[in-house]
Amino acid sequence: MTRLVTDPFRAQRGMALVEAAIALPLVLLVLIPVGEITRLFVQYSTLAHHTRSAVRYVAERAISDTTGKPVITSALTTAAQNIVVYGAPMGGGEPVIDGLTIAEVSPPVITAGGNVQLSVTHPYRSLLQLGGRLPGLGFAADLTLEDLPMTVAYTMRPL
């Protein structure tokens, strides 16, 4: 005997896969830029944290004699640059941010007001292989992330 009643779920088979195939590119279009911008903020925060730590390190040790005038020695300069790049005054190991080098860290200087200043400029390198661009898709201009310079500068009074 032939079956006259059909299974109502039989017609729905495969629909979830088709819907997922349609929705996945749209979801990725939203999530990938969010992830990339989050990565940018994390790297900037890490760079700012280590720069601030280096300035504090120099500010605590810059007063070397009884005159009260700050003096930055070459050992202090090297230690400050190592703190920014490696996270420790002695240096060594992996950089805290991929691609960060000592050359990108300016030596700490004494400003006209007697404060210690340190600045770092490091280009952000995108993980996206889209030429470093996040497409605006007609809603906004394309956002260029390739070699976006992250510049951090801190000034502290010697303690």
State the predicted function of each range:
Residues R13, A20, I37, H50-S53:
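Residues within well-formed alpha-helices
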Residues L26, Q43, I72, L76:
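Conserved acidic
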Residues Q12-M15, Q43:
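Glutamine-centric residue-chemistry signal
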Residues A16, A20-E36:
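Alpha-helical hydrophobic helix detector
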Residues T2-R3, H49-L159:
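Short, conserved structural patches
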Residues E36-A48:
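Membrane-proximal amphipathic alpha-helices
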Residues M1-R13:
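N-terminal leader/signal peptides at the extreme start of proteins
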